[in-house]
């Protein structure tokens, strides 16, 4: 279900682009262009709208096109998979570090660049955000419900066998641990 939603959301948001769409903003020199790569919606690395593969392909196209002088990464994302975000960030770092490419990547944050959205902006040469952009919070969240008190009240004693101390750390039947 989540996979189907991610696919739908990313298709609606325009993920899955594998080539540039050319838009003329100002008439003038045609040998100097700026590539715009969208990071819109959930950052994910699976399915037909694989954002990681698409962004890597667009960076490769930008690196080979001599008319492209810079890349703008247009971000409007709440984040997504940590591995996908890291892979995109790593691709940007490699693009920026390659002396043969020598083109800046600039992040432009839209309404939201949170978590993985902020993560992919971090290696960019410059980052621009609107004063109302929701941004920040690189990290991972893990949630669980806890039924320990309820189990005590109804007199049920769960038994769990594990091969290590933390194997069942998110079990809803264990007492909550305060870090």
Question: What is the meaning of each model-derived region?
Answer:
Residues 1-103, 112-179:
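Small-residue-centered hinge/linker elements
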């Amino acid at each position: 279900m989540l996979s189907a939603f991610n696919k739908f959301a990313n298709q609606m948001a325009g993920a899955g682009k594998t080539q540039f769409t050319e838009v003329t903003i100002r008439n003038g020199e045609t040998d100097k262009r700026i590539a715009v790569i969208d990071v819109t919606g959930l950052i994910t690395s699976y399915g037909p709208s694989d954002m990681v593969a698409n962004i890597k392909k667009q960076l490769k196209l930008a690196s080979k096109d001599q008319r492209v002088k810079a890349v703008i990464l247009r971000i409007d994302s709440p984040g997504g998979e940590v591995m996908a975000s890291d892979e995109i960030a790593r691709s940007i770092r490699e693009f920026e570090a390659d002396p043969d490419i020598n083109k800046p990547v600039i992040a432009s944050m839209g309404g939201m660049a949170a978590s993985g959205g902020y993560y992919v902006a971090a290696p960019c040469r410059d980052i621009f955000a609107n004063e109302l952009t929701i941004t920040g919070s690189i990290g991972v969240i893990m949630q669980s419900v806890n039924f320990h008190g309820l189990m005590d009240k109804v007199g049920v004693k769960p038994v769990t066998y594990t091969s290590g101390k933390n194997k069942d750390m998110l079990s809803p039947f264990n007492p909550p641990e305060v870090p």
